[in-house]
Amino acid sequence: MMDKHEQGISMKIGNNRPLHGSVLAGVVGVLVLAGCQRQGEPAPATDAAPAAETAAVDPAPAAEAPLDLRDVIENNEREVVGISYPAGIDRYPGLARALQGYATSARSDLQQALDGLGNDKPTMPYELSLSFEKLLETPQLVVVSADGSRYTGGAHGEPLVARFVWLPQQQQMLSAEKLVPDAKGWKAISDFVAEQLRERVATRLSGEDMDPAQLQESLRNASRMIADGTGPQADNFSQFQPLTDDKGQITALRFVFPPYQVGPYSDGTQTADVPAAVVLPHVAKDYVELFARG
């Protein structure tokens, strides 16, 4: 049974802080330097050889393995797996590898849960549902979302929520830590987001039929979860997506919070938009030109 979770999700899995996260991607390069002397055989005394003759030559870096971003559909009595990738994303190999790494990690966790059953069969098939979607593509920015769930027993699946912000010109991922490098910036963002989320939950709860004491208790509980999940650290805001104008410049950042981070599971994935005017004074100088001004 595949659940479809609400749209909007950086790298966090279930109740844990970022898999997001974070995302596993990379290639191991092995450098081997040869040249050893036989044991037990004294080396003859010779004049020092010219540097050109004795300098070891580093081998060329190992070639990266080719990408294989094919959609996955598997269905048997023990597991149901569905993974889909956006078309053409292999144009950006570094980004594609990050997506592949995230999916591989999620699949590995599912397999680990299945291995824990031994020869037993789960009462319901374990499930991994993961969809990558390209949200934005400009010469400066490519943004991909990952949304889905992993079910390994219990009342419901673990939400899978991540955002990937790729800078094609720099060939690198843009992380929250790089974008806003100082504590003062995260304090400003934290205050703005927390207030927005508190106002939203207050509006929702005030429309429900509950007595004043119950309403106040619900508001206190909600405020406590929001405060815990929006503390002024980059880790709490690791999942974000830029919103841009028609020129491709960033006008706001949409921060994405999976279930349990700022509210109960029943509230689903939540988002908060922070305008460029709030963020820009704290953005690292290397990324200021990505933002709209005025």
Please state what every model-predicted region is.
Residues 6-25:
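Bacterial N-terminal signal peptides that target proteins for export
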Residues 33-35:
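C-terminal motif of bacterial Sec signal peptides marking the signal peptidase cleavage site
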Residues 37-294:
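Compositionally biased intrinsically disordered regions enriched in Thr/Gly
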